[in-house]
Amino acid sequence: MTNNFDAIRKYVEELGIPQQYDTRCDLYFDIQLIRRGKDHPGLPAANYTFKTYYIDCLDNFDKYKEEIIKCCEMFGLRAYVAVNVKSKYKACLETIQKYAHNLTNGESRKPWRVFASVCGGQDGEEKRWVVDCDSDDCDNLEEYLQNIILSIRQCESAYYDPIVMTIPTRSGYHIITHPFNINRFKKICDAKSITPPEIKKNHITLLYENIQKL
């Protein structure tokens, strides 16, 4: 089982998500409940987004916690959370623009998907990256993780420390970072003869899963 609710709650609070709903706050983040094909190899078309929550205050994050956990355990889902908080105003504006574009081109089927599509692809207000350290990339995961963290800190960045936090995942860790010099990072990894992990911009990290190993 992986339960990152406490760590993520603190993380989004530091990014400006208020405790209670505040009309003056433009920020939100989304949580997706996803069924992964590798968790259900016997199911056809197993990759599926079961539900998405749009959260703009910690009260709602707390409110939906139990529901998210129950859904994950009942249906074998993983809960993922966006690492970048987003703008409600920009989401509304981009949705209107996309509706207008679709209608101009004669496309009006399934309009309810437009908002979800906009939110899923929307840039964050403050860019954070996910560095995916997987146990498949190394023999010793903990040693590999520390090597990657040290290598990131050796790169040029606009921030004193590009490392924000480390999140446990089902098969390793996600290092959430500020942007850093990727080319420099790859050269450092090559010099150390370590496999550079995948770097994912505007991505998601694991909030919760309790899937039994096959």
Segments (PLM) and residue ranges:
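Signature for HUH/AEP ssDNA processing cores
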Residues: 1-169, 180, 187-188, 204-214
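A common structural junction motif
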Residues: 156, 189-199
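Short hydrophobic/aromatic beta-strand micro-patches
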Residues: 176-178
